[in-house]
C-alpha cells in the first residue's frame, strides 16, 4: 500500500503580509478620499440649489447665510468652507442658471450651421426665459452684486461664448459684411441681454415673441455679405 505523506501548508512570507496590509491601507485611504469628495460636491450643490430657490423667492438682499445653510441642511461652517461670502454664492447660482439654459439650447441647436445656429440659439433662449421665468434670478439683482466683469466672465463660458464663436467662424468664412468683430459680437449678445433684463415682463415677452424673432432675423440678414 502507498505510504501516507503528511501535507505541509506553506506559510505566507512576512513581506507578503506587509504587501497585503499596504494594499488594504491605501485602498481604505482612496475610498475615504472619494467619500469626502462626494460629500464636498453634495454639500456645494445643496448650498447652490437652496440659495437659488431663496434668491428667486425673496430676493438676494432678503436672504441670510443662516437661512441658506438651514435650507441646505448644513452648518454655517460648511457654508464658509465652500464660499467666502454670499456674493460668491450668488455667482455660483447665476452660473448654474446659465448652465441650465445652455444645456436646453444645446440639445435643440445644430451649432455647426452658423446662420441657422444664431437664429436657433436666440429663439430657444427666448422660449426658455418665457417658460422658466418664475425660477430665474433676475439679472438686475445679479449684476450690481457681482459686477459686470464677473457677469461677462461667466456668460462667456456659455451662451455668449457660443455666439462669439459662431460670429468668428462666419467672419473667417467671409459670410459677414466687413464690420468690426467686437462690435458685431456685442450687438448680437445685446439681444440676449435685452431679453434677460425684461425677463420679469413675462406677458410682454410672450405676446411679442413673434416680433422679437422677426426683428432679430431681419437684423441677421442685414449682416450677411451677399
Residue ranges and their predicted role:
Residues 92, 106-131, 185-188:
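Hydrophobic alpha-helical connector segments
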Residues 124-125, 177-198, 211-219:
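Hydrophobic alpha-helical segments that form the core
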Residues 90-97, 104:
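Alpha-helical DNA-contacting segments of helix-turn-helix folds
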Residues 129-149, 197:
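Amphipathic alpha-helical segments used for helix-helix packing
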Residues 99, 148-173, 182-186, 210, ...:
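Amphipathic alpha-helical packing segments from all-alpha helical-bundle domains
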Residues 73-83:
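Short hydrophobic/aromatic patch on the recognition helix
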Residues 11-58, 62-74, 88:
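Basic, helix-initiating cap at the start of DNA-binding domains
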Amino acid at each position: 500500500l502507498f505510504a501516507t505523506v503528511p501535507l505541509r501548508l506553506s506559510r505566507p512570507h512576512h513581506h507578503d503580509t506587509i504587501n497585503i496590509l499596504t494594499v488594504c491601507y491605501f485602498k481604505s485611504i482612496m475610498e475615504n478620499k472619494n467619500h469626502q469628495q462626494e460629500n464636498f460636491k453634495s454639500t456645494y450643490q445643496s448650498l447652490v440649489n437652496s440659495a437659488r430657490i431663496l434668491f428667486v423667492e425673496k430676493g438676494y438682499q432678503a436672504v441670510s447665510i443662516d437661512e441658506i445653510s438651514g435650507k441646505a441642511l448644513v452648518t454655517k461652517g460648511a457654508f464658509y468652507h465652500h464660499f467666502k461670502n454670499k456674493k460668491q454664492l450668488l455667482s455660483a447660482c447665476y452660473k448654474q442658471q446659465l448652465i441650465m439654459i445652455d444645456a436646453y439650447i444645446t440639445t435643440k441647436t445644430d451649432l455647426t450651421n452658423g446662420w441657422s445656429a444664431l437664429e436657433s440659439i436666440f429663439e430657444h433662449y427666448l422660449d426658455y426665459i418665457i417658460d422658466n421665468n418664475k425660477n430665474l434670478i433676475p439679472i438686475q439683482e445679479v449684476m450690481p452684486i457681482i459686477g459686470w466683469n464677473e457677469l461677462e466672465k461667466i456668460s462667456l463660458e456659455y451662451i455668449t461664448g457660443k455666439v462669439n464663436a459662431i460670429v468668428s467662424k462666419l467672419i473667417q468664412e467671409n459670410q459677414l459684411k466687413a464690420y468690426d468683430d467686437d462690435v458685431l459680437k456685442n450687438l448680437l449678445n445685446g439681444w440676449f441681454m435685452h431679453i434677460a433684463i425684461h425677463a420679469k415682463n413675462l406677458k410682454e415677452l410672450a405676446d411679442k415673441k413673434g416680433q422679437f424673432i422677426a426683428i432679430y432675423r431681419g437684423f441677421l440678414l442685414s449682416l450677411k455679405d451677399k
